[in-house]
From Swiss-Prot:
It catalyses: a plastoquinone + NADH + (n+1) H(+)(in) = a plastoquinol + NAD(+) + n H(+)(out); a plastoquinone + NADPH + (n+1) H(+)(in) = a plastoquinol + NADP(+) + n H(+)(out). Transmembrane segments: none annotated. Its EC number is 7.1.1.-. It is an enzyme of class 7 (translocase). NDH-1 can be composed of about 15 different subunits; different subcomplexes with different compositions have been identified which probably have different functions. One of its GO terms (molecular function) is oxidoreductase activity, acting on NAD(P)H, quinone or similar compound as acceptor. It is found in: Cellular thylakoid membrane. One of its GO terms (cellular component) is plasma membrane-derived thylakoid membrane. The gene is ndhN. The keyword NADP applies. It is a peripheral membrane protein. This is NAD(P)H-quinone oxidoreductase subunit N. HAMAP family: NDH1_NDH1N (MF_01353). Keywords: Membrane, NAD, NADP, Plastoquinone, Quinone, Thylakoid, Translocase, Transport.
Amino acid sequence: MPLLLSGKEFRDDLESACCLAIQTPLEGGAETRLLRRLKAAGYRTQITSVRGFGDPEVFLLKLHGIRPPHLGHQNIGRNGALGEVQEVIPQLHELLSEEQPLALWLLEGQVLSRSELLALCDLSEKDPQLKIVVEMGGERKLKWQSMRKFLEQ
């Protein structure tokens, strides 16, 4: 399997498309080999799940507020009926300040809507350092394609 030995074809497709939809075998292993090949090629890698993303651009690049879960009886007079808002630092802002390219590997991408997937494509096209790989479910063999081509199907 030359693909798993070098990962060059995958890396070339990732650099040209900026955002890839990938389908991996359910038993796993293929994605970690590809991540190791990307690291060996000079990429920094980060793996995260897309559940709870909200707006992808804000979640990944901007300071944003979240409301922590309600854990029982609390004083609503202090923070209003909606609760307090906590500021959360962005996931990728500091990683993109370095000159090394960054490969963001997103798990469970099938839960994202079409508009969120297109926003990820736009985000990776705006920033030349950022390359995004979104796992879009399982398949019998490893295959990938540009996210925009995947969404056209």
